[in-house]
Every structure is written in C-alpha cells, then in structure tokens.
Amino acid sequence: MLGSGIKAERLRVNLRLVINRLKLLEKKKTELAQKARKEIADYLAAGKDERARIRVEHIIREDYLVEAMEILELYCDLLLARFGLIQSMKELDSGLAESVSTLIWAAPRLQSEVAELKIVADQLCAKYSKEYGKLCRTNQIGTVNDRLMHKLSVEAPPKILVERYLIEIAKNYNVPYEPDSVVMAEAPPGVETDLIDVGFTDDVKKGGPGRGGGGGFTAPVGGPDGTVPMPMPMPMPSPNTPFSYPLPKGPSDFNGLPVGTYQAFPNIHPPQIPATPPSYESVDDINADKNVSSTQIVGPGPKPEPPAKPASRLTETYDNFVLPELPSVPDTLPTASPGANTSASEDIDFDDLSRRFEELKKKT
C-alpha cells in the first residue's frame, strides 16, 4: 500500500481549498433552499399540491447534498490535523481509513462541484496505491461512511419525508395544507410526532446525527417492539446562589434611636431629637418675657451700636434655612437680660429705628 508519487504540499494545499469551497457551497445552497421554500408555499396557497411535492423532492436532495458536504469538510479537517501521520507512516493508519476511503469514494460524485476534491483523491491514491483507490470507489473495502453514501444516493426521498417538509413549510408561511392521509398512515409507529426525519430508514438504525442545512434531524431509535422511548431530560444545572449583603436589623427612626434598641427596657423612652435646629441664645429670653407688649418690645431698646452683633449672629444661624431676617428680634436682647439699663431707652432715636426697620422689610 505504499505509493511514491505523492506530493505532500500539494495535498495539504488542496485539502484547505476543498474546505473553503465546501463552506461556500453549503452557504449558497442553503440560501437557495430557503428561497425555494417560499415558492413551494405559493404553490400550496394556489392549490398546486403535486407541483409542490416535486419541488420539495428537489429541496430534500439539496439538503442531503449539504449534509454530505459537511461530512466531507470534517474529514478534510481530520486529515489536515493528522497530516504528520500521512507523511511519516508508510501504511494507512486505522484511524484515518474511513476519512481517506470516503474522500476517494466521493471525489467522482462531487468533482463537478468541487474540482479540488479530485486532486486530493489522486494524491491519496498515489500514497496508498491505485488498487486501494479502486476498492474505495466501489466500497469493496467496506470503510466508506454509510451515512455519506445514503446522502449521495440517487434514490427518491421517502414520501413521508416529503409530506413532513410540506407540513412544515405550510406552517412557517401560514398556508393551509391538508397532508395525504394515506402517506401519513404508512409512517413507522412512534415517529408520527417527529417534525422532519431526513433518513429514518438507515440513519435511525445507525443512530447517526443529522447535520443538514434543510433543518433535518435524527429520529429517536425505536425498541424491538417498534415503540420509541421518551428522551431523558437533560440535567438542569444547579443555580448559583447570588452573593447578598446581610440585611439590617431593623429600620431606623429619624426622630430617635434605631428601632429595637430599647426593647429590653419598656419603661425607658429614648430622648426625642427636636425637628428644628437649635436657635440662638435670645429665644429663651423672648419666651421668658411673654407679657411684654409689642410696643414695649419695639420701644425700649439699646443704643444703635449694640444690635449689630446679634443681627450678624442671627444671619449666621439661619443662613442654611433661607429664613427672612426679623428686625424686631435683636431689640429684645437688652430688655430680657437681668440688670439691664432701662434708662438708656430715653436716648434712642425712634426715627432712626423706624427707618432701619423699613429698610429691612424692603430687603426681605
């Protein structure tokens, strides 16, 4: 099985070219199949069911071809990954037998689509002898992928598969369609609820996965009595507990201490914090002299010089609360304090006080 005419670099380059060409063809054929589905929906809406079935058979073949191209793409990737084995070993490695034989078998069937695939097959035949290549092309060696052979076969797709394609196309485009009851009755037991089975004749027996571009999938494998077991649910991952900060012991009372501080002493009440800020010194003096009339508050007052200091203190106290200045408050300071000189009120200039009072009112 040893050949002497292999060119390793040429084989490597063409394997990469085959992969790129296959990816482009898969994308192109998938887009064309999507457009063809819209045409089939129009046929169903117009009542042309037979014509729609013919078009669906063509779509199924294209989907099979896309799946076959995906399989070949994987085999080319495998050969590139193990290219060192191909170069170093004289005999064919058992792990590469299926990949090599499948590529040689598919080359004459897809060389019109992918011309580089024929070059790859010729290089592999040069490496492992022409006799080996002949055995692979006829599958006499028995290592060609059976699923790929099914996808590239010339047999017509099953009727039940055609009906399922039509049902799904009608559902996607909201077109009324009544499937053929005779064909649906011939479906194998246990597969009636399946959406689309792209090869339930061979692939279900082998359990091979469906990777087609037409939305196909593999039906579950049936038992000896023809029944299909229910699939086991996937184990759900355990949710991760999110991190959370510890909650506070209780809400706080803005008028006192936090709630719960004095629960052990029910007879003791926390001191209440006044809602208003503490006022200046003369408030107590004003409350102490409640019986003084308004005329006495304004009349007897100090000389013009002392009121300047209490006025500035009053302004500093109420700056943060945006309260207007009260002109009458500073006049009470000397009268409320004990031992104040009451005779000084005779020297007060009432005209001057009135003028200043009016000016203060205008400012506020």
UniProtKB/Swiss-Prot annotation:
Residues 292-352 are annotated as: Disordered. Keywords: Cell cycle, Cell division, Cytoplasm, Cytoplasmic vesicle, Cytoskeleton, Nucleus, Phosphoprotein. One of its GO terms (biological process) is protein transport. The modification Phosphoserine is found at residue 4. Pfam families: Ist1. Interacts with CHMP1A, CHMP1B, VPS4A and VTA1. Interacts with SPAST, STAMBP, and USP8. May interact with VPS37B. May associate with the ESCRT-I complex. Interacts with MITD1, in competition with VSP4. Interacts with SPART (via MIT domain); leading to the recruitment of SPART to midbodies. Interacts with SPAST. This is IST1 homolog.
